[in-house]
């Protein structure tokens, strides 16, 4: 199984890189880098988030979060907001301008993803999703050891 596992790893890695490179170009067209997009996307879908937890949720070092939040704040795409219950906690909140930008990005973003995945049938997409989820959860166990 080792040879087949290695081949699958290489195929997955190359597919991820190709998709990711293409999507990053799409994001750059809107004046964002992938990390900025990830932060805005998190806030857009999950609401206000403590700065301390954003890094964990998008897999970014805490020192980098401050830099990214500063950049997004300069672009007026998010604001910092003090916690009403804990003075030590600061939240990031997406602004109307940020929401508008993501509303502009998402339709094309989703269409690009659909186009790349269109080589698979609906059933294949479901099977692939389930299998990759199992592999990811299994890999996570090794990471947590």
From Swiss-Prot:
PROSITE patterns: HTH_MARR_1 (PS01117), HTH_MARR_2 (PS50995)
Keywords: DNA-binding, Repressor, Transcription, Transcription regulation
Coiled-coil segments on the chain, per record: none
DNA-binding region per Swiss-Prot/TrEMBL record: 51-74
InterPro entries: HTH_MarR-typ (IPR000835), Tscrpt_reg_MarR-type_CS (IPR023187), WH-like_DNA-bd_sf (IPR036388), WH_DNA-bd_sf (IPR036390)
All residue ranges annotated as the HTH marR-type domain in the record: 5-137
Gene responsible for this protein: mhqR
Induction of the gene: Repressed by 2-methylhydroquinone (2-MHQ), diamide and catechol stress. Not subject to autorepression.
SMART domains in the record: HTH_MARR
Gene Ontology biological-process entries: regulation of DNA-templated transcription; response to stress
Keyword field contains Transcription regulation: yes
Gene Ontology molecular function: any one: DNA-binding transcription factor activity
One Pfam family from the record: MarR
Protein name: HTH-type transcriptional regulator MhqR
Chain's role: Negatively regulates mhqA, mhqED, mhqNOP, and azoR2 which may contribute to the degradation of aromatic compounds.
